[in-house]
Design a protein with these regions (language model features):
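Terminal-region recognition feature
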Residues: 1-186, 190-193, 200-273
């Protein structure tokens, strides 16, 4: 097989890669880097949403809480998980697991991979906006170490809900943006066919976000996460361990304070000379 290097790809090409069905999902990363994982279900309010996978397990021998968007590895699974777009129940489950993690002083590891929260009428009627807002507020105030790993798409508030962490790690071909490039082009230019141009303007790649100070670490993929799976799993485990090591000696109040300052400083110097 011919070797392909993804270092010099355009932003649009990275968006295509971020969306590939063959990329490892949250479930794959959990199986690779978390031992004795026990999934936990339900939001204790309305029901269960399998597009948010969460539970407890051990990372290098230490107990952790893990939460992530779950996409499918084929069309049937993608329909089941709504292509990784959670309902309010999913975000309320995430909130429940975060609060539980803080109670038992477990670090929180999240895997982000979603086009955005599910935009259905039932989801909106069920309080989608409130659930996302509360998830962001809960995660941003946690007094335990938090690490987010962006493994594919990071779309809008649906990604932000479990992505406001102390340390943000991105795979080289993952993305994070306020909305999809197609949506951006449709709204600003009334022409969704200009989505590739939008990709460049939006600064949504891991490299862009590292340069802007939003992302803390970019993991190189080589030929792509869907090809070099073992390499990617090892790299992700190593970077999570490094991030948790940097956070482990800090007290809860210090973690929350530093996280607040980090989030408040995002964009403060953007556009200045």
């Amino acid at each position: 097989m011919m070797e392909v290097n993804t270092k010099n790809l355009t932003a649009a090409e990275r968006v295509v890669l971020a969306r590939k069905t063959e990329r490892p999902s949250t479930r794959d990363y959990i199986e690779a880097v978390i031992d004795d994982f026990i999934p936990l279900a339900g939001d204790r309010n309305k029901g269960e949403d399998e597009s948010i996978l969460g539970g407890i397990g051990f990372f290098r021998g230490k107990p952790v809480t893990v939460i992530g968007h779950q996409k499918g590895n084929d069309l049937e699974e993608n329909i089941k998980y709504r292509f990784g777009m959670p309902n309010p129940e999913g975000y309320r489950k995430a909130i429940r697991l975060m609060e539980q993690a803080e109670k038992f002083k477990r670090p929180v590891i999240t895997f982000v991979d979603t086009p955005g929260a599910y935009p259905g009428i039932e989801a909106e009627a069920g309080g989608q906006g409130e659930a996302i807002a509360k998830s962001i507020a809960t995660m941003s105030c946690l007094k335990v170490p938090t690490v987010s790993v962006f493994i594919g798409e990071g779309g809008s508030g649906g990604a932000l809900a479990i992505g406001v962490a102390d340390k943000m790690i991105m795979l080289e071909n993952s993305i994070f943006s306020i909305l999809s490039p197609e949506g951006f082009a449709s709204i600003l230019w009334k022409d969704s066919s200009r989505w590739e141009e939008a990709c460049e303007v939006m600064k949504l790649t891991a490299g862009d976000l590292l340069e802007l100070g939003i992302c803390d670490k970019v993991i190189e993929e080589g030929e792509g996460a869907h090809i070099n799976k073992t390499h990617i799993f090892n790299s992700v485990e190593r970077e999570i361990a490094k991030a948790l090591g940097q956070l482990s000696g800090k007290k809860g109040e210090q973690l929350a304070s530093e996280r607040y300052k980090k989030l408040r400083n995002i964009g403060r110097d953007y556009g200045r000379d």
